[in-house]
Amino acid sequence: MEKAAVIEWLDAYIKAWESYSPEAIGALFTEDAIYFFHPFEEPVRGRKAIVESWLKDQDPPGTYQGTYAPIAVDGNRAVVQGRSRYFKDSTRSELTRQWDNVFVMEFDDAGRCRSFSEWWVAPRGQA
């Protein structure tokens, strides 16, 4: 996996998160993918379950903003750092929550993610 392909995948990830399109979400992952939302919890297993987990608690349209970039790519593995920001409404004039993120991902040869683990840290004092 080349760095440019990881960047393309991250762009598609952001678009899928913004749209909540089941097709766009599903296209990111292999059929048997595993997704760790939290390192101390069981992962979500399988593309269908991952799509369903994304669709459970949707943010209002236009309130999410993500910026992510690969910091290391080795074969089919990538480590990504970025920021997830959430706003009061779609004007994005009032930031309500944000997290610094690290993703560790493994891809298949077609560029679909087969393993996704994320860690996130909120600013001190954020509820």
What name fits each language-model region?
Residues 34-44, 57-60, 119:
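A short gly/proline-enriched turn/hairpin at secondary-structure junctions
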Residues 13, 25-26, 33, 46, ...:
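Hydrophobic pocket/interface hotspot
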Residues 5, 51-127:
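A beta-strand edge to alpha-helix "cap/lid" segment located at domain peripheries
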Residues 32-34, 96:
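Short hydrophobic/aromatic segments of transmembrane alpha-helices and their interfaces
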Residues 14, 39, 70-72:
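Structured beta->alpha junctions
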